[in-house]
């Protein structure tokens, strides 16, 4: 059987939900027994999002093989069993970088290098590469139809649909149908114009997924279908859901998966979505509520912590609880304000981050959690700061710090957190950190061992700095245990306080491996401990 290609585009506005649509459709096709993968094209000129501000781009999602990617890849992995890698996330910057390097080497034999065919051929080559080993590949095109940046990708899709045959490809266009309160009705004109933009470049959508606040009835579907040359049954209503994990079930109710399977000549299989149904049931009617305070510096944009947010939700579901996440700006946390900001939460989490802004506020929050015996979870930078707090306030090293905070001077001192040897002298920032999955050996009898129920694990990393081993004996003497070690490099990956209700810091990012139907055990146990504190 030939591979099948499902292209997902978006119109009218950005952030319309293309990624969730692709991920949800992937979940439905998997539920019917098909092997899927999903890839994302981002139209920006950055090579990857690794050096972009989270406040502009949202979180950087790290894959097993160490690629720094768009947060939509997190949706793809959470909604399906597919494992993403660097071939699943491609930017305009990567495409141009590859083509221009070939030109410099003389690979084009003196020919004029142009968007068509050179850029479009490279785009198609990336799709074929990502599709290897899968039966179906869903390809999300970032941006909005009509944007200049997206045009080469749309042209490549037009060519591919001819190359692979219309019977082996489907174009799903996600659009927006706004509700005009003054008129009391939904308006289809923006969708019509968005499809018109697609048709002008030779693309006719097979399916329209219409986002809306209100119910789209059959009459409006028929109207949209008529003006957009789409069968009315292929106009899919996608009303706003309470939870993102309702989206696969909502699309199934509209028969999107059935229609696409039939359109591509695939086996319908027997759909099994019981896990998703149970998940939504718990989310809609939990037995408990728990408050978790997340102390960070990127709180103005919640998507900066997207995977973290979802992992906490997963941990709540495993405990039949709704997790109320309270985001706290670390710059506002001081000795005077910490109790008013965190006094009513049941657990405190300090996530990853970079730089000095807001550091002392995070350290104050960690001290509060340790002294008040509030369940605490430190991730990456949060783990490093928990070590600094412990060094200052328990071990008596008042000038304990991280070399990251003094990178531009030659200060010597108590660098409890120090740069790894291979990071010293690194000039380029992009793609040069310790990235991807690495092994960690867990000490028997530790809380980490109780959580994982395993002596060896693999977790994903994104950092330049590590715990300084010359302080390890002093820390353990004063009560902080190094319970997880990367033995290949003798790097401390997990620290914990055995005499605290729940105080764990990890150098890696467990949120990247949490799924709604398979919550990460660290988040399950953190939420469980927070419920006990409540």
From Swiss-Prot:
Binding site for Mg(2+): 72, 140
Binding site for ATP: 15-20, 72
Anything else known: CTPSs have evolved a hybrid strategy for distinguishing between UTP and CTP. The overlapping regions of the product feedback inhibitory and substrate sites recognize a common feature in both compounds, the triphosphate moiety. To differentiate isosteric substrate and product pyrimidine rings, an additional pocket far from the expected kinase/ligase catalytic site, specifically recognizes the cytosine and ribose portions of the product inhibitor.
Activity modulation notes: Allosterically activated by GTP, when glutamine is the substrate; GTP has no effect on the reaction when ammonia is the substrate. The allosteric effector GTP functions by stabilizing the protein conformation that binds the tetrahedral intermediate(s) formed during glutamine hydrolysis. Inhibited by the product CTP, via allosteric rather than competitive inhibition.
UniProt domain Glutamine amidotransferase type-1: residue ranges: 291-534
Gene: pyrG
Classification via CDD domains: CTPS_N, GATase1_CTP_Synthase
Protein name in the entry: CTP synthase
UniProt-annotated stretches for the region Amidoligase domain: 1-266
Family named by the database record: Belongs to the CTP synthase family.
EC number per UniProt: 6.3.4.2
Functional summary from the UniProt entry: Catalyzes the ATP-dependent amination of UTP to CTP with either L-glutamine or ammonia as the source of nitrogen. Regulates intracellular CTP levels through interactions with the four ribonucleotide triphosphates.
Pathway named in the protein's UniProt entry: Pyrimidine metabolism; CTP biosynthesis via de novo pathway; CTP from UDP: step 2/2
Active site as annotated: 380 (nucleophile), 509, 511
Subunit structure, interactors included: Homotetramer.
Top EC class, one word: ligase
Reactions catalysed according to its record: UTP + L-glutamine + ATP + H2O = CTP + L-glutamate + ADP + phosphate + 2 H(+); L-glutamine + H2O = L-glutamate + NH4(+); UTP + NH4(+) + ATP = CTP + ADP + phosphate + 2 H(+)
Domain of life: Bacteria
Organism the protein comes from: Bdellovibrio bacteriovorus (strain ATCC 15356 / DSM 50701 / NCIMB 9529 / HD100)
The keyword Hydrolase is annotated on this UniProt entry: no
């Amino acid at each position: 059987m030939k591979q099948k290609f499902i292209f997902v585009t978006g119109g009218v506005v950005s952030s319309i939900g293309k990624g969730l649509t692709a991920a949800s459709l992937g979940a439905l096709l998997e539920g019917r027994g098909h092997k899927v993968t999903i890839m994302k094209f981002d139209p920006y000129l950055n090579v990857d999002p690794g050096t972009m501000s989270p406040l502009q781009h949202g979180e950087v999602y790290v894959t097993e093989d160490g690629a720094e990617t768009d947060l939509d890849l997190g949706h793809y992995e959470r909604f399906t069993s597919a494992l993403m890698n660097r071939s699943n996330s491609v930017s305009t910057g990567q495409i141009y970088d590859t083509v221009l390097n070939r030109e410099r080497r003389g690979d084009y034999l003196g020919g004029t290098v142009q968007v068509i065919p050179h850029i479009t051929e490279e785009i198609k080559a990336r799709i074929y590469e990502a599709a290897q080993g899968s039966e179906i590949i869903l390809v999300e095109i970032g941006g909005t139809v009509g944007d200049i940046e997206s045009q080469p990708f749309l042209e490549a899709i037009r060519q591919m649909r001819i190359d692979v045959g219309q019977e082996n490809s489907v174009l799903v266009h996600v659009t927006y149908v706004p509700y005009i309160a003054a008129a009391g009705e939904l308006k289809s004109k923006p969708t019509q114009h968005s499809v018109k933009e697609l048709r002008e470049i030779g693309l006719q959508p097979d399916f329209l997924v219409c986002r809306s606040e209100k119910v789209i009835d059959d009459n409006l579907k028929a109207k949209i279908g008529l003006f957009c040359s789409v069968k009315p049954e292929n106009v899919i209503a996608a009303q706003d859901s309470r939870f993102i994990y309702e989206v696969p079930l909502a699309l199934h109710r509209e028969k999107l998966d059935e229609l696409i399977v039939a359109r591509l000549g695939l086996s319908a299989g027997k759909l099994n979505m019981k896990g998703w149904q149970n998940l939504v049931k718990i989310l809609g009617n939990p037995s408990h509520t728990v408050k978790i305070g997340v102390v960070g510096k990127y709180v103005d944009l919640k998507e900066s912590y997207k995977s973290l947010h979802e992992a906490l939700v997963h941990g709540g579901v495993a405990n039949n609880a709704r997790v109320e996440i309270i985001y706290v700006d670390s710059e506002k946390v001081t000795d005077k304000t910490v109790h008013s900001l965190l006094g009513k939460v049941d657990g405190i989490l300090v996530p990853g981050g970079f730089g000095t802004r807001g550091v002392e506020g995070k350290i104050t929050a960690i001290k509060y959690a340790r002294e008040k015996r509030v369940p605490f979870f430190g991730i990456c930078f949060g783990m490093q700061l928990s070590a600094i707090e412990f060094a200052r306030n328990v071990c008596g090293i008042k000038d304990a710090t991280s070399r990251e905070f003094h990178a531009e001077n030659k200060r010597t001192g108590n660098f409890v957190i120090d740069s790894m040897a291979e990071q010293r002298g690194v000039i380029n920032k992009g793609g040069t950190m310790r990235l991807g999955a690495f092994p960690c050996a867990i000490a028997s009898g530790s809380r980490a061992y109780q959580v994982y129920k395993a002596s060896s694990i693999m977790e994903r990393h994104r950092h330049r700095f590590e715990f300084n081993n010359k302080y390890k004996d002093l820390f353990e003497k004063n009560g902080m245990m190094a319970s997880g070690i990367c033995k290949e490099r003798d790097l401390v990956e997990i620290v914990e306080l055995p005499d605290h209700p729940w105080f764990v810091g990890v150098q890696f990012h467990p949120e990247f491996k949490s799924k709604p139907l398979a919550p990460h055990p660290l988040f399950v146990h953190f939420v469980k401990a927070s419920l006990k504190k409540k």
